[in-house]
Amino acid sequence: MGQLISFFGEIPTILQEALNIALIAVSIIATIKGVVNVWKSGLIQLLMFVMLAGRSCSVQIGHHLELEHIILNSSSILPFTPTLCKLNKTYFLVRGPFQAHWGVDLAIGSTTVAVENATKTYTLKSKNFTGCFEGNPDPDSAALLVTWLFNSLHHDYKNDPSILCERVSGENSFRFQINISEPEYCEKILSRMANLFGSFENYCLNNRHIKKLIIIRNLTWSQQCHENHMSAMQLITSNIHTQVVRARRILSFFTWSLSDAVGNDMPGGYCLEKWMLIASQLKCFGNTAVAKCNLNHDSEFCDMLRLFDFNRKAIETLQNKTRSQLNIAINAINSLISDNLLMKNRVKELMDIPFCNYTKFWYVNHTKLNHHSLPRCWLVKNGSYLNESEFRNDWLLESDHLISEILSREYEERQGRTPLSLVDVCFWSTLFYTASIFLHLIRIPTHRHIVGEGCPKPHRLRADSTCACGLYKQKRRPLKWVRSN
């Protein structure tokens, strides 16, 4: 009795504390709801836009998903092959192999420098350049470079106009003169030069000069222009067709041995080292992203990774600058490059369509799980990279694919940790529960009642309205089926 009286005496205190709890709960709910309403009103978004306008362009696709990019260091891809560049619409340069200190220039004009049948002038009717490089300190490399160049221009020694070769005495220099005055031959040569060096003005349409010539001379290389790795790749793929069958496929022997920056095996992914990138120390991609390169050969990024890996090994072995070793390297590199992709991108450039320059690549990154999509090329148009909004559909679709891959991987991992018997038990128990719901809705009757009377339980009536114990003796009374509550 005393405890009951004490309880009633403490009720005001309990109510006061309960009221405090209610006030706190109401305050929290009101604050959260107020913040949500302010966010939905757009005021915060407006302030963020005003503060970040012109300062930030980060693209956040969704929750934990962001659009990021890497820029590959193209200068370290092919140091042992000839590299090409363009100064202007009529002047082009080609650097010798193995980062040579010499090269050749190609100048389009109308000035004649070599005359047929003159002293020290040779007419080339085959690929025999004997006499053109007398006195040159490295005649084999010079002959190889000129051979590659003429092969890339698709010059036919039998049917096309003859090429004149002149050796300048006392200067260890040489000159080649190509007459492109014939319209068809001019279009052919300049179109091939456009494939090699990139787009430039069509000199064949210049009617001010009847005679049109291309002069090729050797020179000392002093970094006159920035070498284009895409042009070097084009030079390689255009020369391989002279050695193997034209229809070919990328070799499938090149499978990824995933490693870290030091070269140790790392099953977790593949890392791009510092020398491969610009403005970044190290970038790693997971197995799922990089392993796609083993399945499909339709990615510019995969081509670049193959070249990086090949370059890392080739520098150690290709120290002897011989023609045979260089041809072996060219064959091996060509088996790693997709010439279809390369040609498509060059054609797109010539047609002023956004194309890939094999330098900048974008990918979708899941910041929480650190999963990446396979990088895709950031296209270029009119000398500048496209804005993110111009290929919005591409990275949104890539983000959907990345989320699907993450969910699929999590599902497979979860399946691997879950016993199959437990899955069966869960399935059949769920099926049983679903069936029981339908049985409950049907409301199956459980016993008989005599119409107009109460429940006869525990007696169980027969079909003739009697029971076994004799309490219900009258037969053939009306019955009905009833469900127990």
Curated annotation (Swiss-Prot):
Annotated positions for site Important for GP-C-mediated membrane fusion: 33
Pinpoint the site Cleavage: 58-59, 251-252
**UniProtKB keywords:** Disulfide bond, Fusion of virus membrane with host endosomal membrane, Fusion of virus membrane with host membrane, Glycoprotein, Host cell membrane, Host endoplasmic reticulum, Host Golgi apparatus, Host membrane, Host-virus interaction, Lipoprotein, Membrane, Metal-binding, Myristate, Transmembrane, Transmembrane helix, Viral attachment to host cell, Viral envelope protein, Viral penetration into host cytoplasm, Virion, Virus endocytosis by host, Virus entry into host cell, Zinc
Q: Name one Pfam family in it.
A: Arena_glycoprot
Q: Where does Zn(2+) 2 bind?
A: 447, 449, 455
User: By its UniProt entry, which InterPro entries does this protein fall under?
Assistant: Arena_glycoprot, Arena_glycoprot_zinc-bd
User: GO annotations under biological process?
Assistant: fusion of virus membrane with host endosome membrane; receptor-mediated endocytosis of virus by host cell; virion attachment to host cell
Q: Where are the transmembrane segments?
A: 18-33, 425-445
Lipoprotein as a keyword of this entry, yes or no, is: yes
Residue ranges, Cytoplasmic side: 34-58, 446-485
Query: Where do the annotations place Zn(2+) 1 binding?
Result: 57, 459, 467, 469
Indicate which residues are glycosylated according to the record. Answer: 88, 128, 179, 218, 357, 365, 382, 387
Q: Which GO terms describe its molecular function?
A: metal ion binding
Q: Where is the signal peptide?
A: none
Extracellular face residues: 2-17, 59-424
Lipid-linked residues (N-myristoyl glycine):
2
One GO cellular component assignment for this chain's record is:
host cell Golgi membrane
Which Cys residues form disulphide pairs? 85-225, 271-284, 293-302, 356-377
State the family it belongs to: Belongs to the arenaviridae GPC protein family.
**Which protein, by its recorded name, is this?**
Pre-glycoprotein polyprotein GP complex
The record lists the organism as: Tamiami mammarenavirus (isolate Rat/United States/W 10777/1964) (TAMV)
